[in-house]
Amino acid sequence: MLKKIIILFLGMFLLSACTDNFRSYFQRSANNRLVDSKGAKGGKRKPVYNNKYITLAKKNIVEDNLDDDNDDDDDYDSDSPLRGERIDPVKRNRDMYLKMIKRDIARQKAESGFAESDDDMTLNRANKKVRKDDSDKEKRMQEELNQIKAMLRETKRDISKYTCPNATVNQNYAPPVTNYEPVNYPPVKNSKPYNNNSKVKQKFIREDDDNGSNACSI
């Protein structure tokens, strides 16, 4: 039984070699695979394109970075009945890549869930965006203003702690009453006269003056 299957397979292989379409079975697909079930679409295989050059061509189309071909020999089709009509391959390729770019944009919008078209960018949407930006700015300004007010209140409290007590005079202030009797001490007898120009005395006088002037400083 196994021999019959082998003989049948070899016979089919030899008979199929006589046909012209047999060679296409071993051609590589667009995905560079020998056996590719996804390479064919509608009975036709896609041409082998290089994705790097397609991406570069799309980039040049978007940036309008095109090199026009000045050779006019290829612009005419000698076999066409419209021989005198000029064929512009640059424009044809540009239109082809523009269609590819539009399809890519539509696919990206569909994947991101953005169903609105470019025509829907109306004045209403622009006004909403501007109002949102203005409201955000006002909110930030209000927060900064509240922070400044809080800093001023805190500074005012700190200043009130270090205010000079003699700055304001209380009209109802009464000196404390003491019941101590005055004591008359006998004068101290000093054989030497007191020197008012002493350096030690002048030093203490200057220190007292400095302490008195800085009594109300913060």
Curated annotation (Swiss-Prot):
Q: Where is the signal peptide?
A: 1-17
Q: Where is the lipid attached (N-palmitoyl cysteine)?
A: C18
Region annotation (Disordered) maps to: 65-88
Report the locations given in the UniProt record: Cell membrane
Coiled-coil region(s): 132-164
Bias (Acidic residues) ranges:
65-78
Major localization listed first in the record, in broad terms: membrane
Q: Lipid attachment points, S-diacylglycerol cysteine kind?
A: C18
Q: Which GO terms describe its cellular component?
A: plasma membrane
Record key words, sorted: Cell membrane, Coiled coil, Lipoprotein, Membrane, Palmitate, Signal
Q: What is this protein called?
A: Uncharacterized lipoprotein RF_0637
This chain's source organism reads Rickettsia felis (strain ATCC VR-1525 / URRWXCal2) (Rickettsia azadi)
Q: What is the lineage of its organism?
A: Bacteria, Pseudomonadati, Pseudomonadota, Alphaproteobacteria, Rickettsiales
